[in-house]
Every structure is written in structure tokens, then in C-alpha cells.
Curated annotation (Swiss-Prot):
<comment type="function">
    <text>Plays a role in virus cell tropism, and may be required for efficient virus replication in macrophages.</text>
</comment>
<dbReference type="GO" id="GO:0042330">
    <property type="term" value="P:taxis"/>
</dbReference>
<dbReference type="InterPro" id="IPR002595">
    <property type="entry name" value="ASFV_MGF360"/>
</dbReference>
<comment type="similarity">
    <text>Belongs to the asfivirus MGF 360 family.</text>
</comment>
<protein>
    <recommendedName>
        <fullName>Protein MGF 360-8L</fullName>
    </recommendedName>
</protein>
<keyword id="KW-0244">Early protein</keyword>
<dbReference type="Pfam" id="PF01671">
    <property type="entry name" value="ASFV_360"/>
</dbReference>
């Protein structure tokens, strides 16, 4: 059960306190990264005031790991009292004092890389992906990540796309993997986290959105002009995985060469994509004879999803 003092601090952190009273918050320990600690009214998230996540929500578990890396004892105690999970704390504690505090608060001793990685990635959530990143990123307390140890998990999720993440630096591979998982499972907070943290990987985000059929993120990238890729190359990526109807259609509407797409699908032996591309070719050549389900020139991802959610490829087109 939370103490009265802990509950009071939590209640105050959920209020909007005028700047002239910030000294009181600092005195009460509601202070972190030179700003008042703000909590979401309806969830267990900290509202960050520092860049690059200004105004964004960060789960208490992730915020706790950040505080542990900073050796901020008061904030570590505070977040743990508020319900943050200290389980992984010892993996990030950089001093003996911080390690001892984490032990007292219930952190698990002796965790290895594989246990941490597998435990967090078992459930694909924004919180788990960001937490996994924060634990391993710039962490001298852990051994260097071994790609081979986690190879089975990575290959299962990325399939052929795994060849695009090869790098001489293991951490770069894992960052790309976490980013890809965020896009694949449409985890908006995690996508934004990696976009803000790794601005140089915007092309990777685009490639993941296309390959994993995330037309919503693809549309956002295209509308905001975050990064540019040749439209026919985008279509080739979309055709690499079968049933990628959403991103294939989006690339088609943007002007990708549908004949080239048909060739690519044949090369990959993706029959369902092939039938779909042939239907799109019919739509382009003669709207009247095309399948009634398909409509031309739609770029709204919600409308594309609604249009194609019941689409079933047929073998009516000759190969």
C-alpha cells in the first residue's frame, strides 16, 4: 500500500503548478532533469519536459531506467514507490550505491543479455521496446549484444528483411530491429521515440513501413515529406512480402510502374501479390472492367484499409 506522502506527491504531480511554486516541487522531490515531474492524469506515464521527447509520455518503467543510469537516488525511490518495475534496475546501475539501492528496492540479480532481450520482446508493446532500448543503449554494465544469440528471434520477425539490417556495429543492428518491430506492430509511441532519437534512420522507417504493409505510417512519412525514395523502388519493397496489398496499392496510386511490379511478384513467387497487381493493372487500363471492390486514386490510409480488408486474390487473371 502506498504511503500518504507517496500518494500526496503523486496527486501533486498530476496537477498543473504555476511556475512561481516550482521551488516547492523541488523541495518535495518532484523534480527531475531540471524540471517539475509531471504525471499523466489517466495512466502510469511521465510527461517529459526535456528534449528530444518534450511533451511526450514515457512509461514509468522506462523513466526509472533513465533515472538509474543518472544515479538519481531520490527519483529512483519516487518512481519505484509510484509503481515502476525495478526488476531490470541492476543491469543499468553504474555505481555501488545505485546497485545497493536497486537491490533493496527488489531488482533482480544476475540477468544476462538473452534473458532481458527475450523477456521484453516476448510481448511487443511500445513500452517494452523502448525499455529494451534504454537498458542496452550506452550501458557499460552489460556485455556487448551478440547478434547470433538473438538471431532466431530477429529472423522470425524480419524474414528476408533481415539482410537490410546487417552492420559491423551490433548495437546498430538492434536499433534497426527495435525500430522495425515498432513499425511492424504499428506501435505509435515507439515509432515516435525512435524517429526523435535516430533522425538519420528515417529511410529505414520508410522501408519498414512499406515492407510490413503499414500504410498508415507510410502515408504519414509521405505527407510530412520526412524522406524520399524512388516510387518504383518503394513498389519493389512492397512486393517482397506476400499479401502486402495496402502498400502495393499506395505505391500504385503514387505512380509506380505496375508492369514492373508484376515482374517482381513473379520473381518472388508471390501469387497473391501477382493477382492483386494484375487487378490494379486492369483498374489502370479500364475502370469499368476492373474488379468492383477496387477504386482508383485513394491515398487516405483508412479508406485504403476499408477498401482492401475484404479483398481476396483470385486466379481469374491468366498468368
Amino acid at each position: 500500500m502506498l504511503s500518504l506522502q507517496t500518494l500526496a506527491k503523486k496527486a501533486v504531480a498530476k496537477q498543473s503548478v504555476p511556475e512561481e511554486y516550482h521551488y516547492i516541487l523541488k523541495y518535495c522531490g518532484l523534480w527531475w532533469q531540471n524540471k517539475p515531474i509531471s504525471l499523466c492524469h489517466y495512466c502510469n506515464y511521465v510527461i517529459l519536459s526535456s528534449t528530444p521527447f518534450k511533451g511526450e509520455l514515457l512509461h514509468l518503467d522506462v523513466a526509472l531506467i533513465m533515472a538509474i543510469k543518472e544515479n538519481n537516488y531520490d527519483v529512483i525511490r519516487l518512481f519505484t514507490e509510484w509503481g515502476a518495475n525495478i526488476y531490470y534496475g541492476l543491469t543499468c546501475a553504474r555505481t555501488e550505491q545505485t546497485q545497493e539501492l536497486c537491490r533493496k528496492l527488489g531488482a533482480k540479480d544476475g540477468l544476462n543479455n538473452k534473458e532481458i532481450f527475450a523477456g521484453l520482446m516476448r510481448h511487443k508493446t511500445s513500452n517494452n521496446i523502448i525499455l529494451c532500448h534504454e537498458i542496452f543503449d550506452k550501458n557499460p554494465m552489460l556485455e556487448a549484444l551478440n547478434v547470433q544469440e538473438m538471431g532466431e528471434e530477429i529472423h522470425r520477425e524480419l524474414k528476408l528483411f533481415i539482410f537490410y539490417i546487417l552492420d559491423n556495429v551490433p548495437m546498430n543492428i538492434f536499433v534497426k530491429y527495435w525500430y522495425a518491430i515498432a513499425v511492424k506492430y504499428k506501435l505509435k509511441r515507439a515509432i515516435f521515440f525512435f524517429y526523435q532519437t535516430y533522425g538519420h534512420l528515417s529511410m529505414w522507417r520508410l522501408m519498414c513501413a512499406i515492407y510490413f504493409n503499414n500504410v498508415f505510417d507510410l502515408h504519414e512519412i509521405y505527407e510530412q515529406k520526412i524522406v524520399h525514395m524512388d516510387i518504383d523502388k518503394m513498389m519493389q519493397l512492397a512486393c517482397m512480402q506476400d499479401y502486402n496489398f495496402l502498400t502495393i496499392y499506395y505505391c500504385f496510386v503514387l505512380g509506380a510502374d505496375i508492369d514492373q511490379a508484376i515482374t517482381v511478384t513473379q520473381w518472388h513467387y508471390h501469387t497473391n501479390n501477382l493477382y492483386f497487381c494484375k487487378d490494379l493493372k486492369d483498374l489502370k487500363q479500364n475502370t469499368l472492367t476492373a474488379r468492383p471492390l477496387l477504386l482508383p486514386n485513394i491515398t487516405d490510409p483508412k479508406k485504403i484499409y476499408t477498401m482492401l480488408k475484404n479483398y481476396l486474390p483470385t486466379s481469374s487473371n491468366s498468368l
